[in-house]
């Protein structure tokens, strides 16, 4: 018989991932799996059974190819002529937290459940974070 996860039975862990010298895309997929809860044996798609993920050294991540100069992110407020673009290099220097949230959000469900999952992601640009009391695991791999 298949066991499904109940909301009250889930015990969430805090996982700290160090992004220093890791490839961005591979790190993001690992984060998405942890947030979604797919690494657990009792994974249930309609229940949020993922862990809390703390990413440190967010701006020291590696990118392959020429993505830092070539990849652009666009924003549009809805007004004429308000399209703005930033390169990946600018995003990484100014707001690495937003960069991680954008990338992970694309890999999670586009529902209320996905919004609840993305709230469990904490990103910090250096190695100091305020979650030392909660963290139990370092580097899931």
Swiss-Prot record:
Signal peptide positions on this chain: none
Key word Ribosomal protein present in the record? Answer: yes
Q: Does the keyword Glycoprotein apply?
A: no
Annotated CDD domains: Ribosomal_L13 (cd00392)
Offer a single GO CC term for the protein.
cytosolic large ribosomal subunit
Keywords carried by this UniProt record: Ribonucleoprotein, Ribosomal protein
Coiled-coil spans are none
Biological processes annotated in GO: negative regulation of translation; translation
For molecular function, the Gene Ontology terms on record are: mRNA binding; structural constituent of ribosome
Q: How does it assemble?
A: Part of the 50S ribosomal subunit.
NCBIfam families, A to Z:
rplM_bact
The protein's matches in PANTHER family, at most eight in alphabetical order, are given as: LARGE RIBOSOMAL SUBUNIT PROTEIN UL13M, RIBOSOMAL PROTEIN L13
**What's its job?**
This protein is one of the early assembly proteins of the 50S ribosomal subunit, although it is not seen to bind rRNA by itself. It is important during the early stages of 50S assembly.
Q: Any idea what this protein is called? A: Large ribosomal subunit protein uL13
Source species, please?
Answer: Helicobacter pylori (strain G27)
């Amino acid at each position: 018989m298949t066991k499904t996860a109940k909301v009250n039975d889930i015990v969430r862990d805090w996982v700290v991932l160090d992004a220093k010298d890791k490839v961005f895309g591979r790190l993001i997929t690992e984060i998405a799996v942890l947030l979604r809860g797919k690494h657990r044996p009792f994974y249930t798609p309609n229940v949020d059974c993922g862990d809390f993920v703390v990413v440190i050294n967010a701006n020291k991540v590696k990118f392959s190819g020429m993505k830092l100069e070539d990849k652009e992110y666009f924003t549009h407020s809805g007004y004429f002529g308000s399209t703005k673009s930033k390169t990946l290099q600018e995003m990484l220097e100014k707001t690495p937290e937003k960069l991680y949230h954008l990338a992970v959000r694309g890999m999670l469900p586009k529902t209320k459940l996905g919004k609840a999952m993305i709230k469990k992601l904490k990103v910090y640009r250096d190695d100091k974070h305020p979650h030392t009391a909660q963290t139990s695991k370092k580097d899931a791999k």
